[in-house]
Amino acid sequence: MIRIPVALPMDSYDICIDEGGLERLGEYLAELGKVNRALVVSNPVVLRHYGARVVRSLNAAGFETASVTVPAGERHKHLRSVERIYQAALEHRLERSSLIVALGGGVVGDMAGFAASTWLRGIRVAQVPTTLLAMVDAAIGGKTGVNHPLGKNLIGTFHQPCLVLIDPQVLGTLPPRETRAAMAEVIKYGVIWDGDLFKRLEQLPSLQRPDARTLTTLLVRSCQAKAEVVVRDEREGGLRAILNYGHTVGHALESATGYRRYLHGEGVALGMAAAGRVAVALDLWSPEELRRQEALIIKARLPVRWKSDIASEALLLRMQSDKKVEAGKVRFVLPEAIGRVHTGVEVPTEVLRRVLDTLRG
């Protein structure tokens, strides 16, 4: 078992990477002190695969346990789905000493975390991610939220989990497309924070389906990178903004296509391709390092262009609703070197439009 501490002033917790850890979830949570009830939030597919194992572990540790499902997919990440969690919390009589277990990918984690942060003005949540993307990103750091018709994650809170439990064994059932999409976030950490990780990715023969040992190594490096950033800036007052690299254009693409065309990681890959080109256009980044980034994205069989039916003007409009807009201006995270980025960069609209146009088709 590998334990990565997230040492925050008020809400410290551990990221535990444990083969077969689902069987021991109840033991991990029992260590946290008095908890009387647990509500497992999942989607129907994940609950069918892993729900019985998780509930059995929780019951064995003395929890009164119930479960509720929310629809799978980003397009269902809205307040109506969260209301299902509230209803289950009411029926199961969750108290302030109770907790919610988020069992699933990033959509489940975001909604379960949001529900936990608002139920009785805040109860504990344990993040148990079952996708690689959620393991390396969404489950860590305490961001929760749901979408609004005009933009992604516009409604949300900061609510740190009491535990992040990662069981790599569950990745054996993950579809190949999901694994590839998660690699976008791993590549992101290499660009924004860990140049050695970027070089390691370049050296690997394949990023499409890494072997178990390589995957665990990438998991650990990515979790460490995210934890290091969050510890330095829990509430995104400055440094943590680097984690938004690729997300401004990525979120706009996801939203503009109704969350049906691109997985989140695919959107991030496209967003990084766009941000990298913007950085080169502004003379902030070298064309050679842009080429290296795009080579890694392609190596993971991720897209670097989108279909021509997505109008640049539609993306520009979506970006105006981005939660990172300040004083009416869209702010970008742009690379300056592998392992280092600028934050809060205001990009001239004509430069951004030109880059978006070059990536269509």
From Swiss-Prot:
Briefly state the protein's biological role.
Catalyzes the conversion of 3-deoxy-D-arabino-heptulosonate 7-phosphate (DAHP) to dehydroquinate (DHQ).
Q: What is this protein called?
A: 3-dehydroquinate synthase
Q: What does the record give as its pathway?
A: Metabolic intermediate biosynthesis; chorismate biosynthesis; chorismate from D-erythrose 4-phosphate and phosphoenolpyruvate: step 2/7
Q: Entry's InterPro entries?
A: Dehydroquinate_synthase, DHQ_synth_AroB, DHQ_synth_fam, DHQS/DOIS_N, DHQS_C
One GO cellular component term, please give it: cytoplasm
HAMAP family from the UniProt entry: DHQ_synthase
The Gene Ontology biological process annotation of the record reads: amino acid biosynthetic process; aromatic amino acid family biosynthetic process; chorismate biosynthetic process
The record's annotation in SUPFAM superfamilies points to: Dehydroquinate synthase-like
Q: Which reaction does it catalyse?
A: 7-phospho-2-dehydro-3-deoxy-D-arabino-heptonate = 3-dehydroquinate + phosphate
Q: Which residues bind NAD(+)?
A: G106, V107, V108, G109, D110, T130, T131, K143, K152
A molecular function GO annotation: metal ion binding
Q: Which organism is it from?
A: Gloeobacter violaceus (strain ATCC 29082 / PCC 7421)
The encoding gene is aroB
